[in-house]
Curated annotation (Swiss-Prot):
It is found in: Nucleus. This is Eomesodermin homolog. It holds the Pfam family T-box. The keyword Transcription regulation applies. Residues 659-673 have a biased composition (Basic and acidic residues). Keywords: Activator, Adaptive immunity, Chromosomal rearrangement, Developmental protein, Differentiation, DNA-binding, Gastrulation, Immunity, Nucleus, Phosphoprotein, Transcription, Transcription regulation. One of its GO terms (molecular function) is DNA-binding transcription factor activity, RNA polymerase II-specific. Its main location: nucleus. The gene is EOMES. Changing residue 667 to Q: In a breast cancer sample; somatic mutation. Residues 276-456 bind DNA. The keyword Transmembrane does not apply. It comes from Homo sapiens (Human). Expressed in CD8+ T-cells.
């Protein structure tokens, strides 16, 4: 009958929940909640209101159709039999507390109370009409929150005692949860996501009882469902999993602040310039090592997440051998040639200069190791912490270490779990003293704006390489005439100084204002013809090269006097005065004029002297000191300017064929003691 099925569902003893006959609660308020004891201890009344609303229809002791009490009282066993209950209650009945002493199953209604509950019958009839049938599948885990009476009422303040449990026989503290095999409802549905920390649980009691095949509660929980008695209380990581093992597995290894602060934090590291590293890695990255130390390119740069913001960490890079082989570049590729030398002594670690620092500091910004230098100097021991000693033709692997330390930077050597190591295979490189693969060299030139130390050597030795990337002229073009297209500038951001004897400068003279480059100014041939190799080699000295640290002056052309035709000189008529010329020459010059005296006197200058000075300066004046709009040498321009400024020769100012020999030596020497002395003092003044 309808009432029997509803009573059957509600009358089964739930795990840890007890029901009492109504005769013990006659003095209560009655109604649908009359089946609960009115004198129960206050800690046990957790969900009484909820229970009265949810079970009011099913806990009624009167039939809906108004059957007599005798008919209902005569068949309590049939309504409460295990056969009618079904297999769905087998697991739940296994953990039920024993029933009353008379051998009957516990029932919320006493047999003698059935005919005398008129008010309960009316409430049951109304509830049965408004509510649907109850099935066990519709009961969620919150139905189990009813407490059982017992001496453990004093432990309700702790979170571990919120749920009913069966104390072990003869033991003051049993496990918090019993361990029946094959329980219908997993305990994970009632636990918070991470369980409870040990600080709030009694130390003598485990959070989980040992099931079949589980040695302990903690072991069963961390087993991950290894046996029928293993409990997966949440979908996350185990609460007290072993930190080293979890670290090896790449998981969190803990639940943040639930354990020891800082011990459960696992860092996540990202290689910032990974696309650039991959470009080099395709061709096998090479890194130059020198005695003085050479910085890496690409350099190591990381982003770090997942650290404890308040903990302190040391961040450093260690460079170790990637394999036990010795390498060499043969046939356009790297091949092994023996075993590596593992006896190389020297510093192998570079500590970031901002170490130690807090986790929030490391996570706030990009961590760059741009100042790390590589050297092959064995004398660079641990005293020089900025250089890492490597051996040429060996493959190395950089590794990033993050070590949790104290505030003063002291590392706890007894806890290796505080060290986290990260390796990126694309950062492997072979240490070399000179680049072997031209692809790597080209990548360095294209991406490294400060790669000047090898650019001139590489360009002079590889400028014959064919291809669209190189705008280099072929051998013996149009027998060394001046009709070739401009080939000084490539498509990329670099300039090849053509300094080979076979490929002496072949530039055309049509480029008026070439753009500036961060390059060494190429030395151009100042001889009388383009095949004069001896004069070219004599002028290729160190004084004509600019230091790498300054920006070079504009690249200009320089030729002997007889090379230019006369119609080219009218372009000089538009020059400004002396002051504007000196401002154009204001760039720092690392040399002094070798042919220009500081002060000229009238008795020191003669016609032969002037001609000799002018003739020699055409050859010895460095070509890179010309201004941006000049087309000839500096001494020639100064002499022509003096003639232009002379009032006696103003009629010849616009002459199309101005020659330096036309200048009157006497007029020239009159002003040199006053004007030219200060003019040439510019070159000799440091």
């Amino acid at each position: 009958m309808q009432l029997g099925e509803q009573l059957l569902v509600s009358s089964v003893n739930l795990p840890g929940a007890h029901f009492y006959p109504l005769e013990s609660a006659r003095g209560g308020s009655g109604g649908s909640a009359g089946h609960l004891p009115s004198a129960a201890p206050s800690p046990q009344k957790l969900d009484l209101d909820k229970a009265s609303k949810k079970f009011s229809g099913s806990l009624s002791c009167e039939a809906v159709s108004g059957e007599p009490a005798a008919a209902s009282a005569g068949a309590p066993a049939a309504m409460l039999s295990d056969t009618d209950a079904g297999d769905a209650f087998a697991s739940a009945a296994a953990v039920a507390k024993p029933g009353p002493p008379d051998g009957r199953k516990g029932s919320p209604c006493g047999e003698e109370e059935l005919p005398s509950a008129a008010a309960a019958a009316a409430a049951a009839a109304a509830a049965a009409a408004a509510t649907a049938r109850y099935s066990m599948d519709s009961l969620s885990s919150e139905r189990y929150y009813l407490q059982s009476p017992g001496p453990q009422g004093s432990e309700l303040a702790a979170p571990c005692s919120l749920f009913p449990y069966q104390a072990a026989a003869g033991a003051p503290h049993g496990p918090v949860y019993p361990a029946p095999n094959g329980a219908r409802y997993p305990y994970g549905s009632m636990l918070p996501p991470g369980g409870f920390p040990a600080a709030v649980c009694p130390p003598g009691r485990a959070q989980f009882g040992p099931g079949a095949g589980a040695g302990s509660g903690a072991g069963g929980s961390s087993g991950g469902g290894g046996g029928p008695g293993t409990y997966q209380y949440s979908q996350g990581a185990p609460l007290y999993g072993p930190y080293p093992g979890a670290a090896a597995a790449g998981s969190c290894g803990g639940l943040g602040g639930l354990g020891v602060p800082g011990s459960g934090f696992r860092a996540h590291v990202y290689l910032c310039n990974r696309p650039l590293w991959l470009k080099f890695h395709r061709h096998q990255t090479e890194m130059i090592i020198t005695k003085q130390g050479r910085r890496m390119f690409p350099f190591l740069s990381f982003n770090i997440n997942g650290l404890n913001p308040t903990a302190h960490y040391n961040v450093f890079v260690e460079v170790v051998l990637a394999d036990p082989n010795h390498w060499r570049f043969q046939g356009g590729k790297w091949v092994t040639c023996g075993k590596a030398d593992n006896n190389m002594q020297g510093n192998k670690m570079y500590v970031h200069p901002e170490s130690p620092n807090t986790g929030s500091h490391w996570m706030r910004q990009e961590i760059s190791f741009g100042k790390l230098k590589l050297t092959n100097n064995k004398g660079a021991n641990n005293n020089n912490t900025q250089m890492i000693v490597l051996q040429s033709l060996h493959k190395y692997q950089p590794r990033l270490h993050i070590v949790e330390v104290t505030e003063d930077g002291v590392e706890d050597l007894n806890e290796p779990s505080k060290t986290q190591t990260f390796t990126f295979s694309e950062t492997q490189f072979i240490a070399v003293t000179a680049y072997q693969n031209t692809d790597i060299t080209q990548l360095k030139i294209d991406h490294n704006p400060f790669a000047k130390g090898f650019r001139d050597n590489y360009d002079s030795s590889h400028q014959i390489v064919p291809g669209g990337r190189y705008g280099v002229q072929s051998f013996f073009p149009e027998p060394f005439v001046n009709t070739l297209p401009q080939a000084r500038y490539y498509n990329g951001e670099r300039t090849v100084p053509q300094t080979n004897g076979l490929l002496s400068p072949q530039q055309s003279e049509e480029v008026a204002n070439p753009p500036q480059r961060w390059l060494v100014t190429p030395v151009q041939q100042p001889g009388t013809n383009k095949l004069d190799i001896s004069s070219y080699e004599s002028e290729y000295t160190s004084s004509t090269l600019l230091p790498y640290g300054i920006k070079s002056l504009p690249l200009q052309t320089s030729h002997a006097l007889g090379y230019y035709p006369d119609p080219t000189f009218p372009a000089m008529a538009g020059w400004g005065g002396r002051g504007s010329y000196q401002r154009k020459m204001a760039a720092g010059l690392p040399w002094t004029s070798r042919t220009s005296p500081t002060v000229f006197s009238e008795d020191q200058l003669s016609k032969e002297k002037v001609k000799e000075e002018i003739g020699s300066s055409w050859i010895e004046t460095p070509p890179s000191i010309k201004s941006l709009d000049s087309n000839d040498s500096g001494v020639y321009t100064s002499a022509c300017k003096r003639r232009r400024l002379s009032p006696s020769n103003s009629s010849n100012e616009n002459s199309p064929s101005i020659k330096c020999e036309d200048i009157n030596a006497e007029e020239y020497s009159k002003d040199t003691s006053k004007g030219m002395g200060g003019y040439y003092a510019f070159y000799t003044t440091p």
